[in-house]
UniProtKB/Swiss-Prot annotation:
Transmembrane segments: 16-36, 84-104, 124-144, 165-185, 198-218, 260-280, 288-308, 320-340, 353-373
InterPro entries: NADH_UbQ_OxRdtase_su1/FPO, NADH_UbQ_OxRdtase_su1_CS
A GO-annotated cellular component: plasma membrane
Species: Mycolicibacterium gilvum (strain PYR-GCK) (Mycobacterium gilvum (strain PYR-GCK))
The UniProt record lists the keyword Plastid: no
Gene Ontology molecular function: any one: NADH dehydrogenase activity
Full protein name: NADH-quinone oxidoreductase subunit H
Highest classification ranks of the organism: Bacteria, Bacillati, Actinomycetota, Actinomycetes, Mycobacteriales
Name of the coding gene: nuoH
Membrane-topology annotation of the record: Multi-pass membrane protein
Main localisation: membrane
Membership in a protein family: Belongs to the complex I subunit 1 family.
Stretch list, region Disordered: 384-410
Length: 410
């Protein structure tokens, strides 16, 4: 197996670069089409119903039919909107979603028509920071969509999304720091190479748990889908959008889901490395086989997104903000200090660093769970001691006094 050097990218012939770009684009589109269909099937199964089963054999062409339907629908532009910003917002959301996948390694070096090339479009010395920066741009499309729509509900959805990204982008970035410390690089291909022996999910479990929570909040998915909460904001930031403009927002959402899943695979699950015991077999991590392992790991995270949507109710906005600022960020900072100390001990010649770090990771995860359980208990205690609600007969906002028939005198 050969790990690509970031300095060697950019030397492929133009047709090979074009082919790899087209391959990444097709991979994302097919993943989105499959994810939408599989999500609807899983939700149907969990809700004891069939799900889509009419278009094509067993409903396999439902996503394609939905795409054609959206393309043929009339594109309405509401009166009073800022037209150019209104039309540009979906484009601003969807383009960064595709750009982030440019530095994700899908496999090792392979031979394509006699040319040796990495299954990766490009790489940078700060590739992970590039992904963090590019994915942050997508929120501008959501905020502009809410502002340009000229309606209160989309505006509130856009503001919620901006606050959500600010809060959880910090926790997500802090979860990367421990990976940088252990890998010694910010290059995605370098991080994958550093996990040749031990995956970082075992060494850096608290960082993985923080990232797992942050990626759900970053993508505005249930139970953190507050910018488009139907019960509060109708449709949120895309209430006034229809036709292909709405389809672009949906495409951006599912591409972002795929991107954060691929990044989790790259940082914590060994990237394209085969899982044990498959990795023992000769050739499991060479040629085109790693693309299969990478895709399977990405789908594992996509199923996690779907499972959360089917099982958990939406959180309140104050609970969501409290989770990010009062739990995830402090835990990340404490964990970074532990990892940096352990790494310094290793550099000083300490030999049992792997076992020690795994033990510390377990202790830190237990402490984080205890803190979360204690906070939940305190909140329940406060709720149980709250004063009883006033009888509706006497009137209490928002219920006016109700007419009550006086009992007849005995």
């Amino acid at each position: 197996m050969t790990y690509p050097d970031p300095t060697l990218f950019g030397h492929d012939p133009w047709w090979l670069i074009l082919a790899k770009s087209l391959g990444v684009f097709v991979f994302l589109l097919l993943t989105v089409l499959a994810a939408i269909l599989i999500e609807r099937k899983i939700l149907g199964r969990m809700q004891l119903r069939l799900g889509p089963n009419r278009v094509g054999p067993r409903g396999l062409l439902q996503s394609l039919a939905d795409g054609i339907k959206l393309a043929l629908k009339e594109g309405l532009v509401p009166a009073g909107v800022d037209k150019w910003i209104y039309l540009a917002a979906p484009v601003i959301s969807v383009i960064p979603a595709f750009m982030a996948f440019a530095v994700i390694p899908l496999g090792p070096e392979v031979s394509v028509f006699g040319h040796r090339t990495a299954l990766q479009l490009t790489d940078l010395p700060v590739a992970v920071l590039y992904i963090l920066a590019v994915t942050s741009i997508g929120v501008y499309g959501i905020v502009l969509a809410g502002w340009a729509s000229g309606s209160v509900y989309p505006l509130l959805g856009g503001l919620r999304s901006s606050a959500q990204v600010i809060s959880y982008e910090i926790a997500m970035a802090l979860s990367f720091v421990a990976v940088f410390i252990y890998a010694g690089t910010m290059s995605t291909s370098g991080i994958v190479a550093a996990q040749n022996d031990v995956w970082f999910i075992f060494l850096l479990l608290p960082s993985f748990l923080v990232y797992l929570t942050s990626m759900v909040g970053e993508t505005n998915r249930a139970p953190f889908d507050l910018p488009e909460a139907e019960g509060e904001l109708v449709g949120g930031f895309h209430t006034e959008y229809s036709s292909l403009k709405f389809a672009m927002f949906m495409l951006a959402e599912y591409v972002n889901m795929t991107t954060v899943s691929a990044l989790a695979t790259t940082l914590f699950l060994g990237g394209w490395h085969a899982p044990w015991p498959i990795s023992i077999a000769d050739g499991a991590n060479s040629d085109w086989w790693p693309l299969l392992w990478f895709t399977a790991k990405v789908w594992l995270f996509l199923f996690f997104f779907m499972w959360l949507r089917a099982t958990l109710p939406r959180m309140r906005y104050d609970q969501f903000m409290r989770l990010g600022w009062k739990l995830l960020i402090p835990v990340s900072l404490a964990w970074i200090a532990i990892v940096a100390t352990t790494r310094a001990m290793q550099n000083q010649g300490y030999q049992g660093w792997v076992t020690a770090l795994i033990g510390v990771a377990g202790v830190a995860a237990i402490l984080a769970s205890l803190l979360a359980w204690r906070a939940l208990r305190a909140r329940r205690r406060r709720t149980s001691h709250s004063p009883p609600a006033q009888s509706s007969d006497h009137g209490a906002f928002p219920v006016p006094p109700l007419p009550v028939k006086e009992p007849a005198d005995a």
